[in-house]
C-alpha cells in the first residue's frame, strides 16, 4: 500500500479526529505509523474493525467504535512518534485530544495480498 497521510488541527475544536485511513486487510505484514506533532498537542492513534463499506453488516461512520492503539507511545502522546500496527485493523485515524497545534499521521503498510 502506498503511504497515506492525514492530519488534524490547528484550530480544531477538540477532541477532533482526522480522516480515516483504510488499510488492506487482505495483505499480510505490519503497518508503520509516523506521527509528526507541531505546536502544543495531545493525540492518540485509534483503530477500528468496523467497516461502513461492508456489504453484509455495515456500520455507520458515526457509530464506529474506535480503540486506542495497542502501542502506548501513540496514546496521549505530546511529541512526534513512530509506531507500528502488528495486527492490521480495517481503519485507523489520529485523534487530537487537546491542544492548539496539529498532528500529521502517515501510514505505510508492508506486504502484498498472498496468492
Model regions: which residues?
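Transition segment at domain starts
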Residues: 1-27
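Viral virion structural and adsorption modules
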Residues: 1-7, 45, 97, 101, ...
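Surface-exposed loop/edge segments in extracytoplasmic proteins
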Residues: 2-5, 52-65, 69
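Beta-sandwich interaction modules
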Residues: 19-28, 64-115
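A short beta-strand element within beta-rich, extracytoplasmic domains
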Residues: 27-37
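Residue-level recognition of well-ordered beta-strand positions that form the cores
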Residues: 34-36, 46, 95
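Short glycine/proline-centered coil/turn motifs in the loop regions
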Residues: 37-39, 99
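Short, surface-exposed beta-strand/strand-loop-strand elements in extracellular ectodomains
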Residues: 40-60, 106-108
Amino acid at each position: 500500500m502506498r503511504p497515506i497521510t492525514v492530519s488534524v488541527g490547528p484550530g480544531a475544536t477538540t477532541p477532533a479526529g482526522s480522516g480515516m485511513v483504510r488499510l488492506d486487510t487482505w495483505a499480510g505484514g505490519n503497518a508503520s505509523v509516523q506521527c509528526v506533532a507541531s505546536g502544543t498537542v495531545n493525540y492518540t492513534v485509534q483503530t477500528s474493525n468496523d467497516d461502513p463499506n461492508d456489504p453484509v453488516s455495515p456500520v455507520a461512520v458515526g457509530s464506529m467504535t474506535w480503540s486506542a492503539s495497542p502501542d502506548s507511545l501513540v496514546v496521549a502522546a505530546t511529541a512526534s512518534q513512530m509506531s507500528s500496527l502488528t495486527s492490521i485493523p480495517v481503519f485507523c485515524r489520529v485523534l487530537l485530544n487537546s491542544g492548539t497545534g496539529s498532528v500529521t499521521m502517515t501510514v505505510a503498510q508492508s506486504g502484498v495480498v498472498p496468492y
